[in-house]
Amino acid sequence: MDTDILKMQDREVFDAIAGETVRQMETLELIASENFTSRAVMQACGSVMTNKYAEGYPGKRYYGGCEFVDIAEDLARERARKLFGCEYVNVQPHSGSSANMAVLFSVLKPGDRIMGLDLSHGGHLTHGSSVNFSGQMFDARSYGVDRETGIIDMNKVEEMALDFKPRLIICGASAYSQGFDFKAFREIADKVGAFLMADIAHPAGLIAAGLLTDPMPHCHFVTTTTHKTLRGPRGGMIMMGKDFENPMGITIKTKNGPRVKMMSEVMDAEVMPGIQGGPLMHIIAGKAVAFGEALRPEFREYAVQVRKNAASMAERFTSLGYNIVSGGTKNHLMLLDLRNKDVNGKVAENLLHDAGITVNKNMVPFDDKSPFVTSGIRIGTAAMTTRGMKEADATLIAELIDRVITGAAESTIAATCKDVKAEIRSLCLQNPLEGYGVTP
């Protein structure tokens, strides 16, 4: 990328970017929520679109001069609808959390009841955690996974819903390696008169590629991030398979008298002006580019390889004696329970960092350690697959991770990390990130 001007004008920021570029090029990214965008996406995000304010929506802006940003947003919406087969989409949320906030605020009042997957069982902060707005503004109850299988027990979800009677049920996760039975969740939601929201931030790319169950026919609302397995810029999005009249009875005045607003109108108003002002048009342009890329046949090939790599890695970890929560993976990630390895998540994360491998410590179900220590690590294959790595590489990576973890208590661990880091660097340079070079 051309950074000559930045290098001359602000060497400190340039050096930080150059350092991060080298880190991404020469170390292995296994954080499940991270990926690498294309150069085209980065160019769109670094374009003159960043200069334009565009409060409102295409054709209905509060500012003039929006004819070209309107084109970009319309392209993003059109491509997202085609990619996910949805009738409604809003591409303006700044993040997945913003998207979730907009949905919750659009159908709930403070104190209303919600249900979501427990954070320590693989859920997300915005699904009802007590430290998040979702658990502070609303009465939240969490369902979890079975202690023995590590899989969500739908019978227990139904029992909880019938007892708690939530206004909204959330199905989705940030550290759950199995799929979601959206049909079963909808049946439960209908029994208690609840809205159903699917948060597909992690598997969105795999769903778009047709590899995992489609939530659109079953869920009232679907939210996602646009990075992770979608390989777009960091951002959020809200979708609905079908638009419908809002059941809250919100009306709008027309020349023929009041009419009930469609849910799409309510949602658009909740995003802007409800929780946001001006959209990030440079990011929306990047989203449009990423969605266009995801519509190509090569993207499905990529998504298939992501799952193959995850399956191969999980299989090797299991053969090496690791416990994978839920027993395996059906998507791009896995959660390793390290309690039988006498290493906590914090130590494992730090040692692997020294070995050139980036993961994140993560709580496991029924964890007795704090979120700052944890008993597990979360691993994902989306980013390594973008580099072109295949199943044999995934197997090798599992073996290299095992060398570090099993040697954690040895006096030679520093040397082990150094050796593994050299192997990882070689592997990364054999599978380069094209066009990411920055000259220090």
Curated annotation (Swiss-Prot):
Keyword Manganese: no
GO biological process per UniProt: glycine biosynthetic process from serine; tetrahydrofolate interconversion
Chief location: cytoplasm
Catalytic activity: (6R)-5,10-methylene-5,6,7,8-tetrahydrofolate + glycine + H2O = (6S)-5,6,7,8-tetrahydrofolate + L-serine
GO cellular component, one term: cytosol
Swiss-Prot/TrEMBL site (Plays an important role in substrate specificity) positions: 227
Domain of life: Bacteria
Function: Catalyzes the reversible interconversion of serine and glycine with tetrahydrofolate (THF) serving as the one-carbon carrier. This reaction serves as the major source of one-carbon groups required for the biosynthesis of purines, thymidylate, methionine, and other important biomolecules. Also exhibits THF-independent aldolase activity toward beta-hydroxyamino acids, producing glycine and aldehydes, via a retro-aldol mechanism.
Name under which the protein is recorded: Serine hydroxymethyltransferase
Lineage of origin: Bacteria, Pseudomonadati, Chlorobiota, Chlorobiia, Chlorobiales
